[in-house]
């Protein structure tokens, strides 16, 4: 069993460069199946989710060349075949293959997706959109087959999303890119990652308008071609490092940051009294003095990102006073709370809210990452704590944070990965 060992209490200093966005690249790679030519992605993060997606593409007959942060994918050999269930079941973003395979072949046979257990994240919205576009859904054991009649081309449709959903918005875009006719998505999610996927599709020859707004229109085309695309910076990784720098840093510059993707998060930090300087593509976080507590309520973009409430929680424990966190998107995103309490934090879940009292001096302890962003919170807590922290279940962390051990070591952290 692999684990991360941290000897905490050391102030960190230096620079860290944010990698390409995980939540973009896990959709961009499946999107490439729609292309009739080679597609190159630059700025691809070194995370296990990418490794798994590459393996899926190769099993299906595509070819992949990887050179550092550059990924070259030739999808022309991809076959119309059932997906490899092992990798599919471990990876929630595998559902993006539904849309891309539907767009290419008129059907997709896939295992049901895995990923972090954060409470209800149903794919009903995805399936409702596919049905509106002429597909039928069949359950076959642990797999699901989504298909048009006799593999016909999927049809454009007018779709209203009952709930704002990043995954369903992207999946509908993928299916619609080569559909017969126009697709309109109303109540679409507005996240930067959706704009990134739309940019790739348009660079491949698709006709997507309105990405980043509540109404997206896609005029289906018959074919898409190869291109080259730069993945946007990971705003969640950036926010995680910014919160970490405020909690345990004595001067850290976070590079490759797009401020406009983090405005609601930065506003909360400013309300706490965090001292930082925003530059064109970087943020410098100073060593902090006294901090004030704030309340956080997550909401769809451009609101406070649910993916940032856990990485920010250890920083909140440094504030003098009481505050609360309400996650309106994923109700079970509280599994980091008992682990932080194990480290001495005055924090608990009351009535569906996280309530904290600070400031708290954390102590090292054995803890377990229950999901990706909870893992990031525990890493920050371990860096803040007196003594040694041992984090298990670290596969969650490694699937979303590129080179995190190396990056933190370069900042002066006493952190290492142990292979038991």
From Swiss-Prot:
<comment type="similarity">
    <text>Belongs to the EPSP synthase family. MurA subfamily.</text>
</comment>
<feature type="binding site">
    <location>
        <position position="329"/>
    </location>
    <ligand>
        <name>UDP-N-acetyl-alpha-D-glucosamine</name>
    </ligand>
</feature>
<dbReference type="Pfam" id="PF00275">
    <property type="entry name" value="EPSP_synthase"/>
</dbReference>
<dbReference type="GO" id="GO:0005737">
    <property type="term" value="C:cytoplasm"/>
</dbReference>
<keyword id="KW-0573">Peptidoglycan synthesis</keyword>
<feature type="binding site">
    <location>
        <position position="92"/>
    </location>
    <ligand>
        <name>UDP-N-acetyl-alpha-D-glucosamine</name>
    </ligand>
</feature>
<dbReference type="GO" id="GO:0019277">
    <property type="term" value="P:UDP-N-acetylgalactosamine biosynthetic process"/>
</dbReference>
<feature type="binding site">
    <location>
        <begin position="22"/>
        <end position="23"/>
    </location>
    <ligand>
        <name>phosphoenolpyruvate</name>
    </ligand>
</feature>
<keyword id="KW-0670">Pyruvate</keyword>
<dbReference type="InterPro" id="IPR001986">
    <property type="entry name" value="Enolpyruvate_Tfrase_dom"/>
</dbReference>
<dbReference type="InterPro" id="IPR036968">
    <property type="entry name" value="Enolpyruvate_Tfrase_sf"/>
</dbReference>
<keyword id="KW-0132">Cell division</keyword>
<dbReference type="GO" id="GO:0008760">
    <property type="term" value="F:UDP-N-acetylglucosamine 1-carboxyvinyltransferase activity"/>
</dbReference>
<feature type="binding site">
    <location>
        <begin position="121"/>
        <end position="125"/>
    </location>
    <ligand>
        <name>UDP-N-acetyl-alpha-D-glucosamine</name>
    </ligand>
</feature>
<feature type="binding site">
    <location>
        <position position="307"/>
    </location>
    <ligand>
        <name>UDP-N-acetyl-alpha-D-glucosamine</name>
    </ligand>
</feature>
<dbReference type="GO" id="GO:0071555">
    <property type="term" value="P:cell wall organization"/>
</dbReference>
<keyword id="KW-0808">Transferase</keyword>
<protein>
    <recommendedName>
        <fullName>UDP-N-acetylglucosamine 1-carboxyvinyltransferase 2</fullName>
        <ecNumber>2.5.1.7</ecNumber>
    </recommendedName>
</protein>
<dbReference type="GO" id="GO:0009252">
    <property type="term" value="P:peptidoglycan biosynthetic process"/>
</dbReference>
<comment type="pathway">
    <text>Cell wall biogenesis; peptidoglycan biosynthesis.</text>
</comment>
<keyword id="KW-0963">Cytoplasm</keyword>
<keyword id="KW-0131">Cell cycle</keyword>
<dbReference type="GO" id="GO:0008360">
    <property type="term" value="P:regulation of cell shape"/>
</dbReference>
<dbReference type="InterPro" id="IPR013792">
    <property type="entry name" value="RNA3'P_cycl/enolpyr_Trfase_a/b"/>
</dbReference>
<feature type="active site" description="Proton donor">
    <location>
        <position position="116"/>
    </location>
</feature>
<feature type="modified residue" description="2-(S-cysteinyl)pyruvic acid O-phosphothioketal">
    <location>
        <position position="116"/>
    </location>
</feature>
<comment type="function">
    <text>Cell wall formation. Adds enolpyruvyl to UDP-N-acetylglucosamine.</text>
</comment>
<dbReference type="GO" id="GO:0051301">
    <property type="term" value="P:cell division"/>
</dbReference>
<dbReference type="InterPro" id="IPR005750">
    <property type="entry name" value="UDP_GlcNAc_COvinyl_MurA"/>
</dbReference>
<keyword id="KW-0133">Cell shape</keyword>
<dbReference type="InterPro" id="IPR050068">
    <property type="entry name" value="MurA_subfamily"/>
</dbReference>
<keyword id="KW-0961">Cell wall biogenesis/degradation</keyword>
């Amino acid at each position: 069993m692999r684990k991360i060992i941290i000897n905490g209490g050391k102030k960190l200093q230096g620079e860290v460069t944010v990698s390409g966005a995980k939540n973009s690249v896990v959709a961009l790679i499946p999107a490439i199946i729609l292309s009739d030519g080679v597609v190159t992605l630059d700025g691809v993060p070194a995370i296990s989710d990418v490794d798994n997606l590459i393996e899926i593409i190769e099993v299906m007959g595509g070819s992949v060349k990887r050179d550092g942060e550059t990924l070259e994918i030739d999808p022309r050999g991809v076959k119309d075949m059932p997906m490899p269930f092992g990798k599919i079941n471990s990876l929630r973003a595998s559902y993006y293959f539904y849309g891309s395979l539907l767009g290419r072949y008129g059907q997709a046979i896939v295992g049901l997706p895995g990923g972090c257990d954060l409470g209800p994240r149903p794919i009903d919205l995805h399936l409702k959109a596919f049905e509106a576009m002429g597909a039928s859904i069949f359950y076959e054991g642990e797999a699901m087959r989504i298909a048009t009649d006799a593999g016909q081309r999927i049809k454009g449709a007018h779709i209203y999303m009952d709930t704002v959903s990043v995954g369903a918005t992207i999946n509908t875009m993928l299916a619609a890119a080569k559909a017969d006719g126009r697709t309109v998505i109303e109540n679409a999610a507005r996240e930067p990652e959706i704009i990134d996927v739309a940019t790739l599709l348009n660079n491949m020859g698709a006709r997507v308008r309105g990405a980043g707004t509540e109404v997206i229109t896609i005029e289906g085309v018959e074919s898409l071609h190869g291109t080259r695309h730069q993945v946007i910076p990971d705003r969640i990784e950036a926010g995680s490092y910014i919160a970490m720098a405020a909690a345990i840093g004595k001067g850290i510059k976070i590079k490759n940051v797009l401020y406009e993707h983090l405005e609601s998060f930065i506003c909360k930090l400013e309300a706490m009294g965090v001292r930082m300087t925003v530059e064109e593509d970087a943020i410098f976080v100073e060593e902090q003095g006294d901090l004030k507590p704030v309340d956080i309520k997550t909401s769809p973009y451009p609101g406070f990102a649910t993916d940032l409430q856990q990485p920010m929680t250890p920083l909140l424990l440094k504030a003098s006073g009481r505050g609360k966190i309400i996650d309106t998107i994923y109700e079970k995103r509280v599994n980091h709370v008992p682990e932080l309490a194990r480290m001495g934090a005055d924090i608990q879940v009351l009535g569906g809210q996280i309530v904290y009292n600070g400031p708290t001096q954390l102590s090292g302890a054995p803890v377990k990452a229950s999901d990706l962003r909870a893992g990031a919170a525990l890493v920050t807590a371990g860096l803040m704590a007196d003594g040694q922290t041992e984090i298990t279940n670290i596969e969650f962390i490694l699937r979303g944070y590129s080179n995190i051990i190396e990056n933190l070591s370069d900042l002066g952290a006493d952190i290492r990965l142990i292979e038991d």
